[in-house]
């Protein structure tokens, strides 16, 4: 496909984006808004953002959800801006500096919350800064400006949603159904690999792919939930399927690890059974029926615990899968599965990364302020706004440097494109609303196609072009003002990119160490006799951390294996029949405190000291288990965990 070719699958969204822009433009001028540009810009960003992220037309609900987040972020930013102005109107410089800190604070929060919701906080940060900068000449008009900005943004969002609904957005339900079938087959094939106990790298690749696919399925569940309330039952089932899929991965990998030391546990009966190849979900269904009969014949005691648990989880998965596909009423058996253990939320391991993002945003905004005051440039305020926008939006993404480059390319492309519209097209179409709408529809259509291709600079070009062309009421054509705005955007993006390069993010290794120590803490916390604590479902949170580790350190197999071993240890100890007595309960609390100290330690010396203390306590704990005559189901996992911690002590403690 050529660089300028248009694929059929890209046309519908391009028309949708053009429609959203035209609707916002028409409504903005019809209601005599002072700056319809904000409504048009909002409609374009809300519609194009999810398409750029998805690399194609977004699924149903994505644009609507992004619109709601933008409304929330705008209102938070407007309220914050009003509070800052009211409190510091007599000290303009201090007021702007506080706004810079507010933008940094919002970026810090957006780095810690779920990636889907971080957009609202990033928006809240730079909205307050936009209000404070814009009202500098006339501070008394602040409330009016805040209300107008909120109104224009809401109009733009409504127009984007209307355009989305008008062109019947894609439903993700069929993709979910197909993935559920395919995922079950992949789970069975992973168990086959683990029972064969073949090449470790092949097994590592297989379970790594399954972790990614299960995480992707969880993202699909979020999309399905946003799409319509009629999928509420399917959403409940998919949430439980997420845990079951992770359980299947854990049991398969534990089956592989057990054979490293005790291969005789997997009998020839099960080895021969899992030799049969499967290609479809129907094949898996037949094999599971046979497998349940084999287990009933051999007895639970003669069946390895990992295979028994795997079959139980796969059977539940099948039952819920049928319910998701048919979306029928939840029956009593399903309800029993869905009333599972409460999920545990873990503390973010990226606090240092979030603090780096805070300083990047704050320092870049302060640098923009100093540049504005030092030069006295009329478009310094525009540069300030672009700095805040780039840093607030870039920091929450995995590669902020590339986002900043995208904005630089976009603002550079917007200069000639905006010049064409400013000097030729808009002056010749402003007398006709129809011609004006057609001209902007053409812009939206072609940039909409490029956005879906994820062309570098396409998203920045769309937003920057709309921002600098004259879409005010009434329209005024001052070339110097246009040039200042265009150059201000470019300078702002370059300054933001410079700060991102200078303030380096060296938090990757620290985040990796914190994640690994959180796995250790989770395994240690599973050693408890507290009934409520044992019922907590840590599995989704642990695999979410593992997925983050895989993204931070792609290809680092030793780290992944260590993390997976800790997850397996957690699951095995959680179900182990630990003797119930006060002596062991008190020691469990002591080990949990020590594990927490390992995570919170700020220096390598303290971390090594607490880790050594934890290893000593585990040795004492093993002795206590022997005294209290704990069964092998308890002593063996604890012994394996202690051995792993001794083996990887340096990786878990040294920077």
Curated annotation (Swiss-Prot):
Output one GO BP term.
carboxylic acid transport
Xref: PANTHER family: MULTIDRUG RESISTANCE PROTEIN MDTO (PTHR30509:SF9), P-HYDROXYBENZOIC ACID EFFLUX PUMP SUBUNIT-RELATED (PTHR30509)
Q: Which GO terms describe its cellular component?
A: plasma membrane
Protein name in UniProt: p-hydroxybenzoic acid efflux pump subunit AaeB
Q: GO molecular-function annotation terms?
A: transmembrane transporter activity
Q: Which of UniProt's keywords are assigned here?
A: Cell inner membrane, Cell membrane, Membrane, Transmembrane, Transmembrane helix, Transport
What are the transmembrane regions? Answer: 13-33, 38-58, 69-89, 93-113, 121-141, 152-172, 370-390, 407-427, 431-451, 459-479, 482-502
Entry membrane topology: Multi-pass membrane protein
Q: Lineage of the source organism?
A: Bacteria, Pseudomonadati, Pseudomonadota, Gammaproteobacteria, Enterobacterales
Q: What induces it?
A: Positively coregulated with aaeA and aaeX by AaeR.
| Superkingdom of the source species | Bacteria
Is this entry keyworded Transcription regulation? no
Matching InterPro entries, A to Z?
Answer: PHBA_efflux_AaeB/fusaric-R, PHBA_efflux_pump_AaeB
Function per UniProt: Forms an efflux pump with AaeA. Could function as a metabolic relief valve, allowing to eliminate certain compounds when they accumulate to high levels in the cell.
Q: Could you tell me where this protein is found in the cell? A: Cell inner membrane
Q: Which family does the record assign?
A: Belongs to the aromatic acid exporter ArAE (TC 2.A.85) family.
């Amino acid at each position: 496909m050529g660089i300028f070719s248009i694929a059929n699958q890209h046309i519908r969204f391009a028309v949708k984006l053009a429609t959203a822009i035209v609707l916002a433009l028409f409504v903005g001028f019809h209601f005599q808004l002072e700056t319809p540009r904000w409504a048009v810009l909002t409609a374009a960003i809300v519609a194009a953002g999810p398409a750029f992220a998805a690399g194609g037309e977004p699924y149903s609900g994505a644009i609507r959800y992004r619109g709601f987040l933008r409304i929330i972020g705008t209102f938070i930013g407007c309220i914050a801006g009003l509070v800052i102005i009211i409190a510091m109107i007599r000290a303009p410089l201090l007021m702007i500096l506080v706004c810079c800190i507010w933008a940094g604070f919002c970026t810090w929060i957006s780095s810690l919350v779920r990636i889907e919701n971080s957009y609202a906080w990033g928006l809240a940060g730079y909205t307050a800064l936009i209000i404070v900068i814009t009202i500098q000449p006339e501070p008394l008009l602040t409330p009016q400006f805040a209300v107008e900005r909120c109104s224009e943004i809401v109009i733009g969002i409504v127009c984007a949603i209307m355009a989305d609904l008008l062109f019947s957005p894609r439903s993700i339900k069929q993709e979910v159904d197909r993935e559920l079938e395919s995922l079950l087959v992949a789970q069975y094939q992973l168990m086959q690999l683990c029972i064969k106990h073949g090449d470790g790298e092949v097994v590592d690749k297989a379970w790594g792919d399954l972790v990614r696919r299960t995480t992707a399925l969880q993202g699909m569940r979020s999309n399905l939930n946003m799409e319509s309330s009629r999928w509420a039952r399917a959403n409940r089932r998919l949430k439980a399927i997420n845990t079951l899929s992770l359980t299947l991965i854990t049991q398969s990998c534990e089956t592989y690890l057990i054979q490293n030391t005790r291969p005789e546990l997997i009998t020839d009966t099960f080895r021969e059974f899992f030799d049969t190849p499967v290609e479809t979900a129907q094949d898996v269904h037949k094999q599971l029926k046979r497998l349940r009969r084999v287990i009933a014949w051999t007895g639970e005691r003669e069946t390895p615990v990992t295979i028994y648990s795997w079959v139980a989880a796969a059977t539940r998965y099948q039952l819920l899968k049928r319910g998701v596909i048919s979306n029928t009423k939840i029956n009593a058996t399903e309800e029993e599965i869905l009333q599972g253990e409460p999920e545990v939320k873990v503390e973010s391991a990226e606090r240092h990364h979030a603090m780096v993002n805070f300083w990047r945003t704050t320092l870049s905004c302060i640098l923009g302020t100093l540049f504005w005051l030092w030069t006295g440039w009329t478009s310094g305020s525009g540069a300030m706004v672009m700095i805040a926008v780039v840093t607030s939006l870039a920091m929450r993404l995995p590669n902020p440097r590339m986002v900043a480059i995208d904005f630089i390319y976009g603002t550079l492309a917007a200069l000639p494109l905006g010049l064409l519209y400013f000097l030729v097209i808009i002056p010749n179409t402003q007398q006709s609303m129809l011609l004006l709408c057609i001209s902007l529809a053409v812009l939206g259509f072609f940039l909409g196609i490029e956005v879906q291709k994820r062309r570098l600079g396409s998203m920045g070009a769309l937003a920057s072009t709309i921002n600098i062309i004259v879409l005010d009421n009434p329209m005024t054509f001052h070339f110097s003002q246009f040039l200042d705005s265009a150059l201000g955007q470019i300078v702002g993006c370059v300054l933001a990119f410079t700060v991102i390069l200078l303030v380096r993010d060296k938090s990757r290794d620290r985040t990796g160490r914190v994640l690994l120590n959180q796995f250790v803490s989770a395994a240690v916390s599973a050693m408890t006799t507290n009934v409520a604590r044992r019922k907590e479902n840590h599995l989704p949170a642990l695999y979410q951390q593992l997925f983050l580790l895989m993204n931070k350190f792609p290809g680092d197999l030793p780290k992944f294996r260590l993390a997976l071993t800790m997850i397996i240890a957690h699951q095995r100890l959680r179900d182990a029949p630990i003797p119930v007595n006060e002596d062991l309960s008190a020691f469990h609390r002591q080990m949990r405190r020590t594990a927490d100290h390992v995570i919170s330690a700020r220096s390598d010396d303290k971390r090594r000291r607490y880790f050594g203390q934890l290893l000593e306590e585990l040795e004492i704990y093993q002795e206590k288990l022997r005294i209290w005559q704990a069964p092998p189901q308890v002593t063996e996992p604890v012994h394996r965990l202690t051995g792993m911690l001794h083996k990887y002590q340096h990786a878990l403690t040294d920077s």
